[in-house]
Amino acid sequence: MAIKDWPEGEGPRDKLLLKGASHLSDAELLAVLLRNGLSGLNAVDLARSLIQEFGGLRSLLCAPKHQVCRLPGVGPVKYAQLQAAAELARRVAQENLQRGQVLTNPDLTRDYLMRQLADRSYEVFAILLLDSQHRVIQFVELFRGTIDSASVYPREVVSLVLEKKAAAVIVCHNHPSGIAEPSQADRRITERLKNALATIDVSLLDHMVVGDREIVSFAERGWIN
């Protein structure tokens, strides 16, 4: 049945306006973004099929364009709408960790990094620059692609730290596989960065590895002394 034929107030857009977005299911929220379905499949049914196809919202939003657009009812326009929504969510998270904010709550840092990196289909190595009071200076994405000990250059990290006058840093990267367990290469990178930063008297507070639903902290495991 087409959504326009549903009882008044039951369509996803009407329900959102009447009750608020929190009252909508994942499929209903996605349907609001998609706006319409295709022949024989309304927007909610299309949204539900997309979520099922990719195994969840996060996997759908981080899927590459060719994987999404190959499905019936989803073209470049709908793909662009989904990507815009995902980017807005990341930017909201970025505003929550504003310049000058003191990182006294580890959960805030985890939530921020999860929103920034968990939905990427490629590896990103980034750095959170802090001042001597552990206030945020800037979050910077440094490297993209396959992250290993050969592709992360300590001198570039040191150069950025000096440029921004940071006193401490948290480095982080994601695992597109969704598994946050650090590799031996991750541990080697961390040791090289810690030693390089020590030469300019800057503390490496942590290296966080972001998976689909968890973050592994090197500091919590005692791997950064």
Swiss-Prot record:
Zn(2+) binds at H173, H175, D186. It comes from the Bacteria. InterPro entries: MPN, RadC_JAB, RuvA_2-like, UPF0758, UPF0758_CS, UPF0758_N. Residues 102-224 form the MPN domain. It holds the Pfam family RadC. GO terms for molecular function: metal ion binding; metallopeptidase activity. The keyword Ribonucleoprotein does not apply. A motif (JAMM motif) lies at residues 173-186. Keywords: Hydrolase, Metal-binding, Metalloprotease, Protease, Zinc. GO terms for biological process: proteolysis. Belongs to the UPF0758 family. This is UPF0758 protein SO_4248.
